[in-house]
């Protein structure tokens, strides 16, 4: 029998219904698989076993090279952790940390009371120092290096601007070489600690041409025969040769103020020499200082784990990178602070 047109329509309709049922069942199965898979991913993330995390860090140029090394070494054992690290100065690090823009702020100065009241939680992780610098082609370089500079000299040069020529200083009679001061434009620990060493001053009291960043300040002095400035030691010394950066000389401090650099005040030839002087307390504090990591309220999660690692296993990389280890009792105290912080 030949099917009528109505029978054809009915058969087609039945086929479509069968297909729809099959498709619906397939869709339901796929949805269930997706839900189960999603649940599995959520649990893994919560457990912290396989989920990737990114730690955001900003702040002091002083800590930047060390932080790069720490992050690279940490990733070798924790490849699931990613880092985004930027400089900008200690002021930026503190602001970013307190505002929640970053997980960790690198701060190369003391933590101010007003920052503590805003929830700043911090630990010291290593130590370095700020040194004065002059251009290596300064015509009076030999006399400057043998005489050094007292706190009073630096105050007259950087703060009062009452000395604008090296010949105006005691023991430099007959010298006629002008002085061009350079300082930092960004809110930073280096300028703060340099000002504190000179006297009861702050960064805003330091005069001269303002330049952004540690590398920028070093380059400005290198480019000016009559330039004088200051830098964190890892921007004043070449990390490969451990000698002062080409174009720079380190300005010795006349610590006993007797008008000359004595043998026990001469420790600037290499980075290793000044590091030893800092470690022994011969080079004063300030301008040596602790370097801090800051977060808002408390260290938690992957950030907490990372900072704990820095204070323990991470300390093995400190000296080779031009930083001075903190005493064991200080590291233990700081580690306890982190371990008692957050979750």
Model features per residue range: what roles?
Residues 1-49:
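Secretory targeting signatures
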Residues 127-128:
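A catalytic-pocket lid/entrance helix-loop region that shapes and gates access to the active site
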Residues 41-98, 107-111, 116, 121-123, ...:
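Exported/periplasmic ABC-transporter solute-binding proteins
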Residues 104:
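Short, structured active-site "lid" loops
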Residues 101:
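Conserved functional loop/turn residues at catalytic and ligand-binding sites
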